Amino acid sequence: MQTAYWVMVMMMVWITAPLSEGGKPNDVIRGLVPDDLTPQLILRSLISRRRSDKDVREGYKCVWKTCMPALWRRHDLKGKD
């Protein structure tokens, strides 16, 4: 907990120190963000990480290396009305 506190304090000092030297808030914020980071790059990375529909409709669910077929694919449940 103490480490998190000191990290927070140091980040506050790191952000506010340039302001005391006459810097503008926008310049300080821009200094924290990499130059090559653009909204298009962020959107592209989010889209590439999204799961495709094929992954969502997968027929098997595996838990602890034990894979069970999905309910709609189990043949023993069909016709038991």
UniProtKB/Swiss-Prot annotation:
Expressed by the venom duct. Disulfide bonds join C62-C67. Keywords: D-amino acid, Disulfide bond, G-protein coupled receptor impairing toxin, Gamma-carboxyglutamic acid, Hydroxylation, Secreted, Signal, Toxin. GO terms for molecular function: toxin activity. The modification D-tryptophan is found at W64. The modification 4-hydroxyproline is found at P69. Its main location: secreted. The modification 4-carboxyglutamate is found at E58. Residues 1-22 form the signal peptide. It is found in: Secreted. One of its GO terms (cellular component) is extracellular region. Residues 23-57, 71-81 form a propeptide. May represent a new lead for the potential development of an analgesic that acts via opioid-independent pathways. Moderately activates human somatostatin receptors (SSTR) with a specific activation of SSTR1 (EC(50)=2.9 uM) and SSTR4 (EC(50)=5.1 uM). In vivo, does not cause behavioral changes in mice within a few minutes of intracranial injection, but causes a progressive loss of movement thereafter. Four to five hours after injection, mice recover, even with the highest dose tested (5.4 mg/kg). Shows antinociception and antihyperalgesia activities in two mouse models of acute pain, most probably by acting outside the central nervous system. Belongs to the conotoxin C superfamily. Consomatin family. The cysteine framework is C-C. Consomatins evolved by gene duplication of a 'Somatostatin and related peptides (SSRP)' gene expressed in the snail neuroendocrine system. In addition, this peptide adopts nearly identical conformations as in the somatostatin drug analog Octreotide. As this drug, it contains a D-Trp at the same position, whose synthesis is a common strategy used for enhancing the metabolic stability of compounds in drug design. This is Consomatin Ro1.
